[in-house]
Amino acid sequence: MKDLSHYGPALCVKFYNDYVLAGYGPFIHVYDYHSATLINKCRLFHYNKVHGLSLSSEGKILAYGARSVTIVELEDVLKKESLVDFERINSDWITGATFSFDNLQIYLLTCYNKVLICDLNCEVLFRKSLGGERSILYSGIIKVFGPDKVYVNAGTVMGGVIIWDLFSETKIHNLLGHEGSIFYVNLSNNGRYVASCSDDRSIRLWDLETGKQLSVGWSHTARIWNLMFFDNDSKLISVSEDCTCRVWNIIESRENVAELSISNVYEVHLIKSIWGVDVKDDEMIAVTSGNDGRLKLIDLLQLKRHGDEETSFSLDDIAKQCGDIFEKNESIKGFQWFSFGVIAITSLGKILKYSDVTKQWKLLLTNEKFNSYPITNGIQTQNIAVFSNNKSDILLIKFSKDSADIIETEEFHLDELSKTNNCLVTEYDDDSFLLTLQSPNPREKFVCLEISLQNLKIKSKHCFNKPENFSSSCLTSFRNHILVGSRFSTLVIYNLLDESEEPFIIRRLSPGDTTTSIEFVEDKDNSAVFSVTNRDGYYVFIELTKNSLEEGPYRLSYKVLHSNKMMKGFLEGAFFNSKGEYITYGFKSSLFYLYNETNCYELASEVCGGSHRLWNLAKITDGHVLMYIKASRFHLRKIYNSIVPETLENGVHGREIRDISICPVSNTNTNDNFKDGHIFCTASEDTTIKLGYFNNRTGKVQNFWTQRKHVSGLQRCQFINHKLMISSSAREELFLWELNDKYNKRPYMTIRQALPVSTNNSDLRIMDFDVKFISQSGDFLLVTVYSDSTIKIWHYRENQNKFDLIMQGRYKTCCLFNVVFIALKEELLVVISPTDGHLVVYNITEYVPFSVDPISGDLVDHKLDATISNLPAPVAQLPVHQSGVKSLDYVANATRTSATILTGGDDNGLGLSNLKLDDSNKVTLKTSDFIAAAASSTITSGMLINGGKEVITTSVDQVIRAWEITAGKLSLVDKKRTTVADTGSLEIISNDEDADSEKTLLIGGVGLSIWKK
């Protein structure tokens, strides 16, 4: 068994020249941070994780973690796979380590506040300690100021920060003020300040000379794990359990007085804990590493790097530049960004231009027709501004690329509408754009104008009937159709070639209200995919298909491919960037956000004011520009693309992975994009399901979506065929998901149905489930087991998309961990594994309206009516384990007369049992082998592979074991330690027809590892 890739907690991170070095389990990863290229992955320790790194100016790396320490050359780390031979084991836990001033020795700080001075072979030369102190340390660093000046900064578990001189072994200060353990301490390079963070969520700044507390910084909402000084000791950067990275200014008001002031907050990791942080001072770039395995680069000069990121003007400022005077209550009522700058309109019809080159405002013209509720739109790529009012007047202005000239203007009135309350525009084809007008009168038509891009003349006019409760909010075009978003999560599709054709209406697309954006995504054959967002946080991907009819041209149909909900407040729109990542934007309270939904991190944020805000977001060459009015000032905020890659690793879940499932390969799948690997799902304690893809050869994982439908930690997820997946969790949540992977750019996944719950406020957990498909049908039988010992059997009907309960009962009063259907001969058996250590078998053949095909084992539907029946008594019970049976797998023999059952338990045991039907179909269940100490802790997963001849097990002791089965007996053939903590889930891709073929193992827990066997 060999490692292919690993994603898990990254505990430390350091910049070194053009590299970023990160501690990933027992490995160190080296990246070129300018290109986000992983240069090498080198193993430093046998078992322990790398907790900290120190780098010498000569290219040596000092790494430590738990009791392990090693010194290696950077050149070797860049080229070699393993350097574990250099690992040395210390007698005590190491909390900090660094090189001496001349780089000829190292200092190791242990958890007992002792320092070991070692040579470069890690041999101890001297031991230093502080007399009279018996503190246990949670953290600590050693700060080297010179050959004879070395300070030890010890963060104790009892809330004190002890600073002592290494060579004189004398105490300098015991800084008291924190409540709870000290998680990190740091000293400024100039020797003036000490900064500490702790369990109490505060950062405290101390004067090193006097020991006086200078300032307390409150901002983090959870424990703070790490901090450091940067920018000539004028700033602090801190990272926390709250997944934010925060920057603090140290404001010196007078001598020996300094204040901590929060400067920036970056939401950069998932769910729980950022562990490491470092700053490259000369470029002002930070890197963070977290529990989710992400390595995130942060541009600390996001608001200053280009010099024109933030601009604002009052109406007086604009008036001075224009040489014009605005009326007392006049205000800006609309604005649009173009290649040259901004075009804006005031409440009295004054049209203004702001040049992004000269930074000057100019009054272009005044049109008093547009002093009545003006609406501003534009075709940004063509520099065409569109103004409308509530009296159905339209003004079009086309500018030259440099805005020096107005090329064309056109003004017209629409007689078809008595009043207008909304105007929308969208690009159409190479020669024209579309403009739609809506009247508040429900009896009046919805008007769509096709307008020439060259002379701004109306080329054609379309008047459509409006559906009931129609209120247009967004618009896009596709071929000869327009798609109009409306309130009540409604989408209306009009055919521009036939005004008399009834519109195609999609109602209640999501539970939210106003549709905020519609974007074309991709198409294939006769189908096209659109992204639809909703202000209440929902986004949906729909597939529109043209179905040819014998009579008439075609008929439209739609299907929801993907649905999800943002957790960021109001959602105003979304788009895909050049990397294929889904970017969303909107408002959370008064904060505007730009968010990478694919990889789950914030790109930018801006405080924008209240709910009735006037704003606009536009694309520019190297980013976006946000325009908004706040406190009567017009603000321009340019959000540039980062000068460095956003991430070096995207990571996985923020908390442990409970289950993994690989999608079986479909014989009908014609998409070649996923042929080098597999689509798979991970279900996590963080309540989310991630849909991703891994490459078979490299093990590289790409995430596509993070589903948030569950409200509690996941228990199980399982693909039941190549297009359906089931997930379960607490609160009796069980969802049936449908996968669509026919499109070229990404797969999609949406909920098809939810299992009915027993009560409105259930707290039961669905521990496991299994399905049995009905032959030549999409229908299946589903068995679910619950934490209160309940067993339920359901019939899913595909054509009705409905779960019907057909059987229920209880085992005893203990929790049920696992369940499987086993079809032997013509009998359908249900096997459960409860917490009492037994295997329990039920024969339900006579109680379900199906029979079993003895050859294939599939169910045969006899179209019989089913009533809810009680679960029959067990036909066999076998005590296999002393306590809970945590894993269950089986393989039936070729004749389907018996099955081999594998169990792993809380008692560290591994059991092999034989389930058999005799000639009279009586069930016998016997243990064929049991290994009492198959692991040193709970066996969490076990899988039979190679037709039941081999076994792979995972256990909490972080050891993966491979076993062989010979004549019904288990024998250990291989074992290897994994760096995934809380090892719980296992999934294997293998070819049972070829025993010698390579097998791919996915191992989940706190992290994800991909192995080959």
From Swiss-Prot:
It comes from the Eukaryota. Residues 48-223, 658-938 are annotated as: Interacts with TRM7. Keywords: Cytoplasm, Endosome, Repeat, tRNA processing, WD repeat. InterPro entries: tRNA_Anticodon_Mtase-Reg, WD40/YVTN_repeat-like_dom_sf, WD40_repeat_CS, WD40_repeat_dom_sf, WD40_rpt. One of its GO terms (cellular component) is endosome. GO terms for molecular function: enzyme regulator activity; tRNA binding. SUPFAM superfamilies: WD40 repeat-like. Disruption phenotype: Increases Ty1 mobility 31-fold. Slow cell population growth. Simultaneous knockout of TRM732 leads to activation of the general control amino acid (GAAC) response and severely decreases cell population growth. It is found in: Cytoplasm; Endosome. Pfam families: WD40. One of its GO terms (biological process) is tRNA methylation. Coiled coil: none annotated. WD repeats lie at residues 5-41, 45-84, 132-174, 177-216, 219-258, 269-308, 465-504, 586-625, 652-702, 709-747, 761-804, 811-852, 880-928, 934-973, 975-1013. Together with methyltransferase TRM7, methylates the 2'-O-ribose of nucleotides at position 34 of the anticodon loop of substrate tRNAs. Required for the correct positioning of the substrate tRNA for methylation. Also plays a role in the regulation of the retromer complex and is required for the recycling of plasma membrane proteins like CAN1 and MUP1 from endosomes. Involved in regulation of Ty1 transposition. Interacts with TRM7; the interaction is direct, and required for 2'-O-methylation of position 34 in substrate tRNAs. Interacts with RRT2. Belongs to the WD repeat WDR6 family. PANTHER family: WD REPEAT PROTEIN, WD REPEAT-CONTAINING PROTEIN 6. Present with 3450 molecules/cell in log phase SD medium. This is tRNA (34-2'-O)-methyltransferase regulator RTT10. It comes from Saccharomyces cerevisiae (strain ATCC 204508 / S288c). The gene is RTT10.
